[in-house]
Swiss-Prot record:
It is a multi-pass membrane protein. It comes from Escherichia coli (strain K12). NCBIfam families: PRK10755.1. The keyword Iron-sulfur does not apply. The gene is basS. This is Sensor protein BasS.
Length: 363
């Protein structure tokens, strides 16, 4: 009984199934041939006993005998091929299920594949894939933890060095402004590295929440963003009478996304300019940030969303802002776009997120 419960290989299943089908239909064909041959022999014997040597009658009997063998033979071959096809399809069904499972997965879904099969090859493939996913998950988690730990540990000593420089400047009247500015840039870099590491940890378990973009993301960030823009006398304009849109995601990460978009616009826009946040609804939920800066080279949009790539080194930064935006957008299964504004100079950076279907259905 234990032997019967053991999984067998896909090759053995195919051979046994096709062999059984051919055997069954061969037996049916032999039985049919025996039955028809017996009937024809009896007819010929009857004709001989009755002295019916009519050639036309004999040829008709021969044609009937040939037809009685060919027609069932063609039918049997067609039926055999059809049943073999269905059998092979049934045996390879786990492969089709595995294909659908893999195609339906997102890049961040690293949970084990739950497909059970009594076929050795399928079990071996699923086991190998799950082992690969497990090792990949462990590697990514270790990388994120390492980045977060390093970034967190660097913030304290950098803040201490900055404090000592300020005390040194007050005590000895030394100009340490360039050093302080450089330290501020390093602290900003460390902060962005920490954000990027944390962004990759939030959705590992798939805990999505109902988030209203205006109420939960834009309005809570307004004071912080306005304070940042005041440094260059810039004005933050909120969506005008826009209806709120609900998405599935994490409000903290979406506020981080918005802050990085506004910070990028603030960095590359002239003093006294306006930076606008817009909301609109099409196939999904669109949140856009528009500025009045010089615009971008649209041929390099793909490069700008990569880590440590800057549009212009004169404006500072280390090029992680848009990489963080791209990463958070991916975690929300959305799309991130960069383009120049059509009606005037400036850049339009926007993300399209999936609307919350449950809330949409309730409406």
């Amino acid at each position: 009984m234990h032997f019967l419960r053991r999984p067998i290989s896909l090759r053995q299943r195919l051979i046994l199934t096709i062999g059984a089908i051919l055997l069954v239909f061969e037996l049916i064909s032999v039985f049919w041939l025996w039955h028809e041959s017996t009937e024809q022999i009896q007819l010929f014997e009857q004709a001989l006993r009755d002295n019916r040597n009519n050639d036309r009658h004999i040829m008709r009997e021969i044609r009937e005998a040939v037809a009685s063998l060919i027609v069932p033979g063609v039918f049997m071959v067609s039926l055999t091929l059809f049943i073999c096809y269905q059998a092979v399809r049934r045996i390879t069904r786990p492969l089709a299920e595995l294909q659908k499972e893999l195609e339906a997965r997102t890049a961040d879904n690293l949970t084990p594949i739950a497909i059970h099969s009594a076929t050795l090859e399928i079990e071996a493939v699923v086991s190998a894939l799950n082992d690969l996913v497990s090792r990949l998950t462990s590697t990514l988690d270790n990388e994120r933890l390492f980045t977060a730990d390093v970034a967190h540990e660097l913030r304290t000593p950098l803040a201490g060095v900055r404090l000592h420089l300020e005390l040194l400047a007050k005590t000895h009247h030394i100009d340490v402004a360039p050093l302080v500015a450089r330290l501020d840039q390093m602290m900003e870099s460390v902060s962005q590295l920490l954000q990027l590491a944390r962004a990759g940890q939030s959705f590992s378990s798939g805990n999505y929440q109902h988030v209203k973009l205006l109420e939960d993301v834009i309005l809570p960030s307004y004071d912080e963003l306005s304070t940042m823009l005041d440094q260059r006398q810039q004005t933050l304009l909120l969506p005008e009478s826009a209806a709120d849109i609900t998405v599935q995601g994490d409000a903290t990460l979406l506020r981080m996304l918005l802050r990085n978009l506004v910070e990028n616009a603030h960095r590359y826009s002239p003093q006294g300019s306006n930076i606008m946040i817009k909301l609109q609804e099409d196939d999904g939920a669109v949140m856009a940030v528009e500025d009045e800066g010089p615009g971008i080279d649209e041929s390099k949009c793909g490069e700008l969303s990569k880590a440590f790539v800057r549009m212009d080194s004169r404006y500072g930064g280390i090029g992680l802002g848009l990489s963080i935006v791209s990463r958070i957008t991916q975690l929300h299964h959305g799309q991130f776009f960069l383009q120049n504004r059509q009606e005037t100079s400036g850049t339009r950076a926007w993300v399209r997120l999936k609307k919350d279907q449950y809330v949409a259905n309730q409406i």
